[in-house]
Curated annotation (Swiss-Prot):
UniProt binding sites for GTP: 250-254, 271, 293-295, 315, 350, 355
Name of the featured protein: Riboflavin biosynthesis protein RibBA
Pathway(s) it belongs to: Cofactor biosynthesis; riboflavin biosynthesis; 2-hydroxy-3-oxobutyl phosphate from D-ribulose 5-phosphate: step 1/1; Cofactor biosynthesis; riboflavin biosynthesis; 5-amino-6-(D-ribitylamino)uracil from GTP: step 1/4
Residues that, per the record, bind Zn(2+): 255, 266, 268
Record's function text: Catalyzes the conversion of D-ribulose 5-phosphate to formate and 3,4-dihydroxy-2-butanone 4-phosphate.
Keywords for this protein: GTP-binding, Hydrolase, Lyase, Magnesium, Manganese, Metal-binding, Multifunctional enzyme, Nucleotide-binding, Riboflavin biosynthesis, Zinc
Location of region: GTP cyclohydrolase II: 200-397
Binding positions (D-ribulose 5-phosphate): 26-27, 31, 138-142, 162
GO BP of this protein: riboflavin biosynthetic process
Co-factor note (free text): Binds 2 divalent metal cations per subunit. Magnesium or manganese.
Region feature (DHBP synthase): 1-199
InterPro entries membership: DHBP_synth_RibB-like_a/b_dom, DHBP_synthase_RibB, GTP_cyclohydro_II, RibA, RibA-like_sf, Riboflavin_synth_RibBA
Family that this chain belongs to: In the N-terminal section; belongs to the DHBP synthase family.
Length: 397
């Protein structure tokens, strides 16, 4: 149904337009996107004729500073915090509204000699400032446009226009597919762009290495930072893992209440200890400790979920009532750490099939699933049963 990111990049490099869709739980819309560097009056005319939305120009913070583009409003109350600046027209234009003059304004924005005084305000071009980090920080069309431009090796600026149906309603995926077919345009999703970037870019940095004696044995501890969300993760390595043989690996998500306080609401603490003990017994392996508290929702939200569980909701229902998916964890950063450690073939300590799929999506091969089941307690029986029934965990209860 959708095209590959590589196909869209090739078209963009040729000055063509692509359609980019965002998540159905976000704006659930599609935009025409082109590279600002290659913009023409014909492309602008196509966008306003068949897109019918607002023509905007996503740019980096650097462009905004050079052109002295202040925020459109002092207090942004937009639900998605779309970063509009004041609208502009280049001083060489007349009304600034024609396709030709809008293209002129956009091209002059990219002119390194241009400065703030070269543009009238307000105008008919609406710059948008993309967040640093692009779609990995904010999954919006603004960031997608700048990311696509950078992936093409072009100036980091795009031209976007929302796609609206002839009857004035927003075009959804079925409408967008028809539009893409009608005009022979590549169509991609922001979700796929995120996956593409995570697959092709190195987001983790090995920061420090120490020897760490523990109650379970002595490990080589390696601390990692990541450029995606600034969270710090740690890998505990046992033995020589560079032989190319399958390595026993546990990817453990942080659980303060279980790992530190010994909470009986979950089985996290016992799983952590059992994994370390098993790796020590085998003499070779990795425990990757990921800062993904509460399946990715954070400590306070996990406690709020616990409160809802006390009111009768199960662990999945509690997450959903708080507005989160059942499992918000992302395995891309963990996969990059494992690859940095030189691992390729894993014997994965897990009861969670999604974790296997999540890691294998990043060119890691799970040779074997090694069960890690702890005895159920009265306090966590319902929790564990929900993980089986709703999250597909492989447990014998």
């Amino acid at each position: 149904m959708f095209h590959r990111i590589e196909e869209a990049l090739e078209d963009l490099k040729q000055g063509k337009v692509v359609i980019v869709c965002d998540d159905e739980n976000r704006e659930n819309e599609g935009d025409f996107i082109a590279l600002a560097e290659y913009i023409t009056p014909e492309t602008i005319n196509f966008m306003i004729t068949h897109g019918r939305g607002l023509v905007c120009v996503p740019i980096t913070e650097g462009y905004a500073e050079r052109l002295q583009l202040e925020p459109m409003v002092a207090h942004n109350t937009d639900s998605h915090h779309t970063a509009f600046t004041v609208s502009i027209d280049h001083v060489s234009t007349t009304t600034g509204i024609s396709a030709h003059e809008r293209a002129t304004t956009i091209r002059e924005m990219l002119n390194p000699a241009s400065k703030g005084a070269d543009f009238n305000r307000p105008g008919h071009i609406f710059p948008l400032i993309a967040k640093e980090g692009g779609v990995l920080r904010r999954a919006g069309h603004t960031e997608a446009a700048v990311d696509l431009a950078q992936l093409c090796g072009a100036e980091p600026a795009g031209v976007i226009c929302e796609i609206i149906n002839e009857d004035g309603t927003m075009a959804r995926v079925p409408d967008l597919l028809q539009c893409a077919k009608q005009f022979d345009i590549k169509m991609i999703t922001i979700e796929d762009l995120i996956a593409y970037r995570r697959h092709h870019e190195t987001l983790v940095t090995r920061e420090v290495e120490i020897t760490l004696p523990t109650d379970f044995g002595t490990f080589h501890a390696i601390g990692y930072s990541n450029s995606l969300d600034s969270k710090e993760h740690i890998a505990l390595v046992k033995g020589d893992i560079s032989t190319g043989d399958p390595v026993l690996v546990r990817v453990h998500s942080e659980c303060l209440t279980g790992d530190v306080f010994g909470s009986c609401r979950c089985d996290c603490g016992p799983q952590l200890h059992a994994a370390l003990a098993q790796i020590e017994r085998e003499g070779k392996g990795v425990l990757l400790y990921m800062r993904q508290e509460g399946r990715g929702i954070g400590l306070l939200n996990k406690l709020r979920a616990y409160k809802l569980q006390e009111e009768g909701f199960d662990t999945v229902e509690a997450n959903e009532k708080l507005g989160f998916p059942a499992d918000l964890r992302d395995y891309g950063i963990g996969a990059q750490i494992l690859k940095d450690l030189g691992l390729q073939h894993l014997r994965l300590l897990t009861n969670n099939p999604r974790k296997i799929a999540g890691l294998q999506g990043y060119d890691l091969e799970v040779i074997e699933r090694v069960p890690l089941q702890m005895p159920a307690k009265e306090e966590n029986k319902t929790y564990l049963q929900t993980k089986v029934n709703k999250l597909g965990h492989l447990l014998n209860l």
